[in-house]
């Protein structure tokens, strides 16, 4: 029987070698400490400095767009948690290289290495041009709000192809806003606590069957824009909520301009970013 740790995550899960890409990024740094207990070896990659390797860690400085290096990186890996790539909106070319070329390199390397499961960081910005008064499910058409959102929609479609063609299972996580606590009014609906992030990733790694799945990464917030019932088959049960932060956040937020696209659409500020050339 599986045991559960103090954060509500399954602890019986154990891989030989687990790869975490983007390990120097914000969520990567958080998951680096949390995933150690789920594998014999935790292989970490990023283009930025990863510091010193702790016991059981393997450090690799690798650019996602370097196809040969990615193939070497995936050798001997049992499963992948992909947090790498450009994580914000910006000019198209860097997003193209990291989030489109890079995710292709990841999946092709996984195919060659015989990897059977990937947890892929997608984004809520895949559906950012839905209104905040709408409830969206993964079954609804994508409506990306940015080049970044477009790149994440590509990643989901590529993952679908690699499952249908090669049987590589993927859980695509449309992550909301994962921080220690929500920072603004929008995040009251989109917040994903670090503990719930761990619960979600571990659920996706440990579920007996994933197939191809798209789920939203959010905590048990009172106000929600996303129908996440599809995550139930993965065993993800969020335990945190943004509600305890509501009063303090709303007290310091400016009055809402109901005509502001950042207030109208779920993508917030992303719907107004750019053009960049």
What do these predicted ranges mean?
Residues 15-37:
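N-terminal Rossmann NAD(P)H-binding glycine-rich loop of SDR-like oxidoreductase domains
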Residues 51, 57, 62-98:
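NAD(P)H-binding glycine-rich loop region in Rossmannoid oxidoreductase-like domains
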Residues 65, 94-105, 113, 124, ...:
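Glycine-rich NAD(P)-binding loop of the Rossmann-fold in SDR/ketoreductase-type enzymes
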Residues 89, 124-133, 147, 179-181:
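Conserved catalytic-site region of short-chain dehydrogenase/reductase
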Residues 174-181, 191-212, 220:
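Alpha-helical substrate-binding/gating segment
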Residues 220-237, 252-276:
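Conserved C-terminal active-site "lid" loop/helix of NAD(P)H-dependent oxidoreductases
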């Amino acid at each position: 029987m599986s045991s559960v740790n103090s954060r509500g995550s399954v602890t019986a899960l154990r891989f030989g070698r687990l790869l975490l890409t983007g390990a120097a990024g914000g969520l990567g740094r958080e998951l680096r400490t949390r995933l150690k207990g789920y594998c014999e070896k935790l292989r970490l990659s990023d283009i930025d400095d990863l510091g010193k390797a702790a016991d059981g860690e393997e450090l690799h400085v690798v650019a996602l767009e370097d196809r040969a290096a990615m193939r070497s990186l995936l050798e001997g890996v049992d499963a992948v948690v992909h947090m790498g790539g450009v994580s914000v909106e910006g000019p198209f070319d860097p997003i193209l290289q990291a989030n489109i070329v890079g995710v292709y390199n990841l999946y092709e390397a996984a195919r060659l290495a015989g990897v059977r499961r990937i947890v892929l960081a997608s984004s809520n910005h895949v559906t950012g041009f839905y209104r905040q008064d709408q409830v969206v499910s993964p079954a609804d058409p994508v409506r990306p709000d940015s080049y970044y959102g477009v790149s994440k929609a590509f990643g989901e479609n590529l993952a679908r192809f690699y499952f249908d063609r090669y049987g590589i299972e993927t859980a695509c996580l449309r992550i909301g806003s994962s921080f220690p606590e929500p920072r603004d009014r929008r995040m009251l609906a989109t917040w994903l606590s670090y503990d719930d992030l761990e619960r979600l990733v571990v659920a996706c790694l440990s579920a007996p069957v994933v197939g191809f799945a798209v789920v939203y990464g959010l905590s048990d917030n009172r106000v929600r824009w996303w129908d996440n019932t599809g995550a139930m088959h993965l065993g993800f049960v969020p335990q945190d909520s943004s509600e305890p932060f509501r009063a303090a956040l709303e007290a310091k937020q400016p009055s809402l301009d109901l005509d502001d696209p950042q207030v109208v659409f779920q993508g917030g500020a992303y719907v107004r970013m750019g053009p960049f050339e």
